Every structure is written in structure tokens, then in C-alpha cells.
């Protein structure tokens, strides 16, 4: 059954490698479960409802990508797009989150049409091979920078934009996080050099265990105001009935005072950012995985773009901002993921 669905032998992989790759991708993008509810709650949405919507939209999108395109690309509400949703459309422009969700829904429908008519595929194939390789390298550097920021190894600075972490000044928060990140990075690199396919996953798990030990010993201290949370697993049960507060609400949007021109501007903003975000991600991740053919084209690209478009509209109906293909999928690809099973 699994072989028939995902063609593991044809792609020179096996179930064990694909599962490890899938877990690796999940671990690298799980941060969205905390970040997305926080960001969209600024638009007036219930954070618990957004958490559930984020999970469901990610599930629908990733399953669509796996079953329609058989690619190891995970989907979830996109960073940047959720910030635009909350702080620009609902914040500066003053529209309700229901109107914003409707814009995302319509964007997804437009994308479905563009995908079925091969317009998005034509744009993807029109990108020169040299640019595709450049995008792949750029995305790698982008992920590395995000990782350094998340690990607090680099922090913002008014003079130089970024600078190194002050280990001594904030030892119990920033400092210990940076040290743990360095330890995890060293472990991951050593395992990767030695050929362990689960190197990234093992590195993440070891770092987490060391983090919990640091918290237990008082070396790492929780400071919610500064964004340093408990590293222990939470046993708190989510109230799943909250999903009713966002599910289908895009169809109840009140357009009084919005104006058709303003709605089109919002729609086009979501449309173009999502289009090139998805294309850039597919180029970078597929290039890293060696999935491009001799003409530097991605086989079955139409199905991949269609899955992404379906996820966008489905996510809006469920109650979250634009659901898109995640560049963190490259971590799973690096762990050996080659099919939708990952």
C-alpha cells in the first residue's frame, strides 16, 4: 500500500528514512504552532482557535502535497504572510480579520485556477537554471540566519543591525540558549559528517534534553516577558471546541466600508507574495533534493502548485492566514526525505 502510494523504491528510499525525514521537518517548523496564534491574536482572533486552525491547515496542506504530488514538502501558515495579515491588513488598514480571511480564500481560488491553467508552472519553468541555483543558496543562508536568531547567537543591534549574543550579560536566558544551540549544532555536524541520516533530528532531541536538564538545575530560567518559555512538555489539553470561532468565518465577513478596490489591493498583495514565496521554496528545496530534471525543471510541478493552492483556501476556511510550502522542508530533505511519506 505504502509502496504503491509513494513509490519508495523508485525514489531510492525506504519507510524508515522517510519517517525520520518527516520528524525532522516537523521539529524544524513546529515553532509556527506558538508563533502563529500569537501573531493572529493581534488581529482580534482567538489564539486557541488559531492554534487548532494552524494544526488543521498544516495537516490538510501537507497531506495534499503528499498525495497529489508525492513530494516531501510540508505546508503551514507562512511567516511574513501572517505578519502582513495581522499588522497591515487588520492593523494599519483597519479591516476585520474576517475580511482578511476572505481575501486569503479568494487568493487560493485564483491560485487553483492559475495552477490548473499552467500559468504558475510557466513562471516556475521560466526561471533560469543559474537563478534557481542562486535561490537554493540564498534560501540556505536565510534559514541559517533565522536559526542563529532563534538560538540567540545573533541579536539585533541599533548600530550594526545584528551582533553576537552577550553570553555573560543574559546568561540564564540568552546565554544558555546560545550555548545549547552551539552544542546541538556541533553534535548535528559531527553526526552528519559521519553519515547519520537522522543527524538533524538527533541534534534537536539532544539539545532539548540538555535544555530540560538546564532548566531543572536552574541554569536556564523561564522569562515569558522576554520570550523564554519552559522547555518541559505541556500536559495542558486544548479546548478543541474553540475552532468554531474561526471555522467558516471568512464567509461571514462584513464588507461595509471596505471598497472593491481596497479588497483587490489586499488580495493582490497576498497573491504575489505567496506566489513567489512558494516558487522560491520549491526551487530551493527541490534543487537540494536533486529532484530537478536535466532541463532544471521539477517533474509534477503542476500537482505541487495545486496542492499549495488548495491548502491556502482550505486554511482560510478553517481560520488561518495563507498556508504555504515551508522552506524548512529542506531539513527533512537533508535527512533523506524524497517522497510524500516524509
Predicted regions and their residues:
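Short, amphipathic, aromatic/basic-enriched membrane-interface segments that mark the entry/exit
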Residues: 42-50, 69-74, 163-176, 333-342
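Membrane-embedded alpha-helical modules
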Residues: 93-209, 213, 342
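Helix-loop-helix junctions within the multi-pass membrane cores of secondary transporters/permeases
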Residues: 2-36, 57, 78-87, 91-139, ...
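Alpha-helical transmembrane segments of multipass membrane proteins
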Residues: 59-67, 88-89, 112, 185-190, ...
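Membrane-helix interface "capping/anchor" motifs
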Residues: 63-77, 190-201, 334-340
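Transmembrane alpha-helix interface/packing and boundary motifs in multi-pass membrane proteins
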Residues: 61-73, 189-192, 269-277, 308-318
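Active-site cofactor/substrate anionic-group-binding motifs, chiefly glycine-
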Residues: 46-92
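Helix-loop-helix hairpins and the membrane-proximal interhelical loops
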Residues: 1-49, 165-169, 204-302
Amino acid at each position: 500500500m505504502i509502496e504503491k502510494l509513494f513509490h519508495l523504491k523508485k525514489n531510492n528510499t525506504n519507510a524508515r528514512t522517510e519517517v525520520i525525514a518527516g520528524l525532522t521537518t516537523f521539529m524544524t517548523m513546529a515553532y509556527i504552532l506558538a508563533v502563529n496564534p500569537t501573531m493572529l491574536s493581534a488581529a482580534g482572533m482567538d489564539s486557541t482557535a488559531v492554534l487548532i486552525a494552524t494544526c488543521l491547515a498544516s495537516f490538510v496542506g501537507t497531506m495534499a502535497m503528499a498525495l497529489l504530488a508525492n513530494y516531501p514538502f510540508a505546508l503551514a501558515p507562512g511567516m511574513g504572510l501572517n505578519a502582513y495579515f495581522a499588522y497591515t491588513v487588520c492593523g494599519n488598514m483597519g479591516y476585520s480579520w474576517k475580511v482578511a480571511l476572505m481575501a486569503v480564500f479568494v487568493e487560493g481560488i485564483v491560485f487553483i485556477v492559475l495552477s490548473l491553467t499552467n500559468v504558475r508552472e510557466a513562471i516556475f519553468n521560466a526561471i533560469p537554471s543559474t537563478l534557481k541555483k542562486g535561490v537554493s543558496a540564498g534560501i540556505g543562508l536565510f534559514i541559517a540566519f533565522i536559526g542563529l536568531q532563534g538560538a540567540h547567537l545573533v541579536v539585533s543591534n541599533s548600530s550594526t543591525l545584528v551582533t553576537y549574543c552577550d553570553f555573560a550579560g543574559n546568561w540564564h536566558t540568552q546565554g544558555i540558549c546560545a550555548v545549547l544551540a552551539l552544542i546541538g549544532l556541533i553534535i548535528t555536524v559531527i553526526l552528519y559528517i559521519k553519515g547519520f541520516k537522522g543527524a538533524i533530528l538527533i541534534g534537536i532531541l539532544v539539545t532539548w534534553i540538555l535544555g530540560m536538564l538546564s532548566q531543572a538545575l536552574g541554569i536556564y530560567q523561564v522569562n515569558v516577558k522576554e520570550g523564554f518559555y519552559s522547555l518541559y512538555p505541556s500536559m495542558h489539553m486544548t479546548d478543541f471546541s474553540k475552532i468554531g470561532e474561526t471555522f467558516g468565518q471568512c464567509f461571514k465577513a462584513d464588507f461595509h466600508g471596505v471598497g472593491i478596490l481596497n479588497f483587490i489591493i489586499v488580495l493582490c498583495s497576498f497573491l504575489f507574495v505567496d506566489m513567489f514565496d512558494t516558487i522560491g521554496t520549491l526551487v530551493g528545496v527541490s534543487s537540494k533534493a536533486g529532484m530537478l530534471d536535466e532541463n532544471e525543471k521539477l517533474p509534477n510541478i503542476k500537482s505541487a502548485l495545486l496542492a499549495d493552492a488548495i491548502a491556502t483556501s482550505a486554511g482560510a476556511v478553517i481560520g488561518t492566514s495563507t498556508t504555504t510550502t515551508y522552506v524548512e522542508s529542506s531539513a527533512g530533505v537533508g535527512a533523506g526525505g524524497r517522497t510524500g511519506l516524509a
